[in-house]
């Protein structure tokens, strides 16, 4: 689903703005993101998450492009991970609490 949506909307718009890119390049990029590495997060492999030296705040979701399981696995792997509650955006009353958690996390992990 995310691959198809990106190929139909994001890819063509990006190629229009960037003449150095082609739809073939977009296809290869999206295939690597959404197909080849589909069992985990698309930006990094598990060993990178496991070795991540910086604090990470994981806010689980349950959508086709942000499935719950990889979020939880990321939080379990990252040595300095914090995890927000889930679901955090199903009602508008929960969003301020999630925002407060993000602000607290950022303040606590601000570089000196």
Language-model region placement:
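Hydrophobic, aromatic-rich cap/lid helix
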Residues: 8-9, 16-45
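Short beta-strand/loop motif that positions the catalytic acidic residue
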Residues: 51-52, 58-60
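Alpha/beta-hydrolase-fold enzymes
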Residues: 1-8
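Short, conserved loop/helix-junction motifs that constitute active-site signature segments
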Residues: 49-53, 76-78
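Acidic beta-to-alpha connecting loop that harbors the catalytic carboxylate
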Residues: 61-64, 88-90
